[in-house]
Design a protein with these regions (language model features):
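Short, conserved post-Walker A segment of ABC-type ATPase nucleotide-binding domains
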Residues: 482, 493-502
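Cytosolic ends of transmembrane helices, especially the final helix of ABC transmembrane type-1 domains
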Residues: 303-307, 322-326, 332, 369-370, ...
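Conserved "ABC signature" C-loop
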Residues: 525-572
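Membrane-integrated ABC transporters
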Residues: 1-170, 184, 188, 214-242, ...
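Primarily ABC-family ATPase nucleotide-binding module
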Residues: 76, 80-84, 220, 224, ...
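ABC-family ATPase nucleotide-binding domain "signature/switch" substructure
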Residues: 498, 535, 569-665
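Loop segments that connect adjacent transmembrane helices in multi-pass transporters
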Residues: 292, 296-347, 437
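A hydrophobic transmembrane-helix motif
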Residues: 132, 176, 180-182, 248-290, ...
Length: 665
């Protein structure tokens, strides 16, 4: 089940400040801690890293050029003379000083912030390497444009020597470019993988803190966050991969724009200005369309997750569905979820087709523009043939850079939807119970005390629509055994939830031992995905020898389990291989191993026969544990001293066991 609240809010999603703030909140912690004014420091560090990479790229270019000239003087003089002259001119200018100062400042600031950066040194190093490789790839593209300019001029002049020399240069560039581009792609994927691991663990830390996983349960009618499992598994992966891909593409576009615009401007100023206007038009149209695409993509992510959840729900309840012969209704419900997702995807296809129509026309028309403008210059003899071909290459590169948003608006819209889903999820985990707290003004006060007592306790449902128990006062002495009875829906299980701190909506006081001294046993015990050993020691990570585990199993009449399932360290789907009665007995084995001061049981023996029930309660009595049971069976009276009866009108009565027997006789 998913909430209807969040999809309505999705219609307001835009490329706005909220989207930017959510992006920073998710992206920043991997590289720099969140905090007041720290975002400015983080963005400043990114800018400084970029400047430092530019400085490193400059010195590498100087070293390779001058070193190459020293080793191959004839080659560099004949074929790379303009490059050598350009480098020599730069060395005589202010550029070397600026590059050196930038590196010194970067090193100083990194030293000053070493406390926050040292544990993040790997990610900053990988990001710096990525930026440097991006500069290198862009430089390779610029070099190739010049090589083909000279190759085409040699062809036009019928100069075979120059042609073969520059073709040899091109081959050398390709030999160097292939491993560089491969390393660039590998580094990008590696950083995305490390980032995904860290960010997923970061979300999991928040998800399991403050019982967020319980408050944000998709089965709860009070949640505003649908399918948190998808947000942690899929949206985080998409965020890290797409963030790096898109931001590096933006950087590449900026570098391409700077590099090839300079080339294009020297060929034709009119071509350059016209290109800028054309790209601005395309970007504006793409942004307008992208606003609608954000909502559609957001809804699609949610609806696909709903469909998947429906299938998982069928798998988890297959036996119950089979007993009820509910296949037809289940298929109908799953089919309805599929139909809703298909309808939204159909709308997505329509918008994608409209955008494709614009993008195709936009891209195909641009192919003739450089020819229309540069051809007259070539026919008039104002430019050579190589320049003509270079103009076409430069025009295409600049247009691609300027049209990044236009050509990738569908991916950007999907990315924005993912940011909003993760951002809303992240914000809710700061206070997962906030929506419930807004609906009421009072909370149950819980304090740690040696024994359990309730004082004027009133328990409401989380949505405050119903009062379950009102003004309940009860003292449970160390020798007491309390049985809670009442009609279905009158609040028996809810009372245990309030004692456990899961439900806080209400009034009054609860005094109880520390939660680690209490063990709660639900009617359907939780079977984790693990070994038999892990099942027995759950929820604690305690070391117990096999003999102790075997003894605990024998006490609850499950002594055959280790031999039946290959020992204590094999993994099985325990929910499937054990009956509910066996699961309940295994839960009592956990009680024996953990030795809690209080055992709180919610119909914990409902699937057991009378004999096994007697064995388990006698075991609890031998442990001298205080226990509270919720149940309906008259046989439970034998093991309890007091009975708390809850009534549908939120009233209650406390009886001794004998008085309650007489009442129901």
């Amino acid at each position: 089940m998913t909430s209807t609240t969040e999809p309505k809010r999705a219609t307001r999603f835009r490329f706005d400040r909220q989207l930017w703030q959510r992006f920073i909140t998710i992206a920043q912690p991997y590289f720099y801690p969140l905090g007041h004014r720290r975002t400015g420091v983080y963005l400043g560090l990114l800018l400084l890293l970029l400047m430092a990479v530019v400085a490193v790229a400059f010195w590498l270019t100087v070293g390779l050029t001058l070193g190459g000239k020293a080793v191959f003087p004839a080659f560099f003089t004949n074929l790379a003379g303009p490059l050598v002259e350009r480098i020599t001119g730069l060395l005589a200018s202010w550029v070397p000083y600026a590059a050196s100062i930038t590196l010194a400042v970067a090193g100083f600031i990194a030293y000053r912030l070493r406390g926050a950066l040292w544990e993040r040194a790997v990610q900053w190093s990988l990001l710096g390497l990525l930026l440097l490789l991006s500069f290198t790839v862009n430089g390779i593209n610029v070099s190739i444009s010049y090589v083909f300019r000279f190759v085409n001029n040699a062809l036009n002049a019928e100069d075979p020597n120059t042609f073969w020399q520059y073709l040899f240069v091109y081959a050398g560039i390709i030999v160097a470019a292939v491993p560089i581009i491969t390393l660039y792609r590998y580094t990008r994927l590696k950083l995305a993988l490390r980032w995904r691991k860290w960010l997923t663990e970061h979300f999991l830390d928040r998800y399991f803190a403050n019982r967020s996983y319980y408050e944000l349960d998709s089965n709860s009618a009070n949640t505003e966050i649908d399918n948190p499992d998808q947000r942690v598994t899929q949206d985080v992966k998409s965020f890290t991969t797409v963030t790096l891909s898109f931001l590096l593409d933006v950087l590449d576009s900026v570098l391409t724009l700077i590099s090839f615009t300079a080339i294009l401007y020297t060929i034709s100023k009119a071509l350059t200005v016209g290109l800028l206007v054309y790209a601005l038009f395309g970007t504006t149209v793409a942004i307008i369309a992208g606003r609608q695409m954000i909502k559609i993509n957001y809804d699609q992510l949610r609806l696909e997750a709903d469909f998947r959840y429906g299938m998982v729900h069928v798998r988890n309840n297959a036996e119950s569905i089979a007993f009820y012969r509910g296949e037809g209704l289940e298929q109908q419900q799953v089919g309805q979820r599929l139909l809703t997702a298909i309808r939204n995807f159909d709308l997505l296809i329509i918008w994608q087709s409209l955008i494709d129509l614009f993008q195709l026309g936009y891209n195909y028309f641009t192919r003739i523009v450089p020819y229309m403008i540069v051809a007259p210059l070539y026919f008039a003899g104002d430019t050579d043939f190589g320049t003509f071909s270079q103009a076409a290459i430069a025009f295409g590169q600049v247009l691609t850079a300027l049209s990044l948003i236009t050509n990738r608006i569908e991916q950007i819209a999907e990315f924005a939807a993912s940011i909003n889903r993760l951002g809303a999820f992240y914000e809710r985990m700061d206070d997962p119970a906030a929506p419930q707290k807004r609906k009421h003004q009072h909370e149950i006060e819980t304090v740690v005390a040696p024994q359990l007592s309730l004082n004027n306790l009133t328990v409401f449902t989380p949505n405050s629509e119903q009062t379950l128990v009102e003004n309940l006062s009860l003292q449970i002495e160390p020798s007491d055994r309390l049985l809670v009875v009442g009609a279905s829906g009158c609040g028996k299980s809810s009372l245990l939830r309030a004692i456990a701190g899961l439900w806080t909506n209400g009034q009054g006081h609860i005094a109880r031992p520390d939660i680690n001294e209490m063990l709660f046993l639900p009617q359907r015990p939780y079977m984790l995905l693990g070994t038999l050993r892990e099942q027995l020691i759950y929820p604690y990570n305690i070391d117990r020898p096999d003999e102790t585990l075997t003894h605990a199993l024998k006490q609850v009449n499950l002594g055959e389990l280790p031999e039946r399932f290959g020992g204590f360290d094999t993994i099985h789907d325990w929910l499937s291989v054990l009956s509910l009665g066996q699961q309940q007995r295994l839960a009592f084995a956990r009680v024996m191993l953990s030795q809690p001061a209080y055992a709180m049981m919610d119909e914990a023996t409902s699937a057991l026969d009378i004999d096994n029930e007697r064995v388990l309660y006698n075991m609890l009595a031998d442990m001298k544990a205080v226990y509270v049971s919720v149940g309906h069976r008259p046989s439970l009276l034998e093991y309890h001293h007091k009975v708390l009866e809850l009534h549908p009108n939120s009233t209650w009565n406390v009886y001794s066991t004998e008085n309650y027997r007489q009442k129901i006789a």
